């Protein structure tokens, strides 16, 4: 089972690919997709879509796991995040991948044992749980790894 974990965002989207081989979890790759806030929205969304598509084609995941979002007090921010999620979900659907969504607190509790863990705690635990993640320093990337990890360890596939 190969999971593509996604921490959705418009400016700095985290992605990660984690596999389960027999009882062993294996980190395969991760990264950040950054868009320029000065670019037109449709160009930013197209860039997210085309970059994630390359990841899907390279790693051939069986499923995508994405973090659920909550409505922010800033409606413009929530709307922009919704655009990014729509572009991501459209791509997931185009490749006929199953998809699971996880609440941020569920991911934090699965990885750290505490549903309100801070970013640095998440990063630390990801490095302990999955070999190959030692060079990850970006919290968006670490969150994507954590989302994929959560999908695999909760057997939510």
UniProtKB/Swiss-Prot annotation:
Keyword check for RNA-binding: no
EC code(s) of this entry: 3.1.21.10
Principal location listed in the UniProt entry: cytoplasm
Gene3D superfamilies to which the protein is assigned, alphabetical: Ribonuclease H-like superfamily/Ribonuclease H
Keywords assigned by UniProt, alphabetized: Cytoplasm, DNA damage, DNA recombination, DNA repair, DNA-binding, Endonuclease, Hydrolase, Magnesium, Metal-binding, Nuclease
Keyword Disulfide bond: no
Molecular function via GO: crossover junction DNA endonuclease activity; DNA binding; magnesium ion binding
Reactions catalysed: Endonucleolytic cleavage at a junction such as a reciprocal single-stranded crossover between two homologous DNA duplexes (Holliday junction)
Class of the enzyme per the UniProt entry, highest EC level: hydrolase
GO terms for biological process, alphabetical: DNA recombination; DNA repair
UniProt subcellular location: Cytoplasm
Purpose: The RuvA-RuvB-RuvC complex processes Holliday junction (HJ) DNA during genetic recombination and DNA repair. Endonuclease that resolves HJ intermediates. Cleaves cruciform DNA by making single-stranded nicks across the HJ at symmetrical positions within the homologous arms, yielding a 5'-phosphate and a 3'-hydroxyl group; requires a central core of homology in the junction. The consensus cleavage sequence is 5'-(A/T)TT(C/G)-3'. Cleavage occurs on the 3'-side of the TT dinucleotide at the point of strand exchange.
Protein name listed in UniProt: Crossover junction endodeoxyribonuclease RuvC
């Amino acid at each position: 089972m190969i999971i593509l974990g996604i921490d959705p965002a418009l400016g700095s989207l985290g992605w990660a690919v984690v596999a389960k081989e027999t009882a062993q979890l294996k980190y395969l790759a991760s990264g950040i997709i950054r868009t320029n806030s000065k670019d037109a929205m449709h160009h930013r969304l197209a860039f997210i879509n085309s970059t994630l598509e390359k990841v899907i084609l390279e790693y051939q995941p069986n499923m995508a796991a994405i973090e659920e979002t909550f409505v922010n007090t800033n409606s413009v921010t929530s709307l922009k995040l919704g655009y990014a999620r729509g572009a991501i979900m459209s791509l997931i659907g185009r490749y006929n991948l199953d998809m699971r969504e996880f609440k941020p607190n569920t991911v934090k509790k699965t990885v750290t044992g505490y549903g309100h863990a801070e970013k640095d705690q998440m990063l630390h635990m990801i490095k302990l749980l999955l070999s190959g993640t030692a060079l990850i320093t970006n919290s968006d990337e670490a969150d994507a790894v954590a989302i994929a990890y959560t999908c695999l360890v909760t057997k939510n596939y």
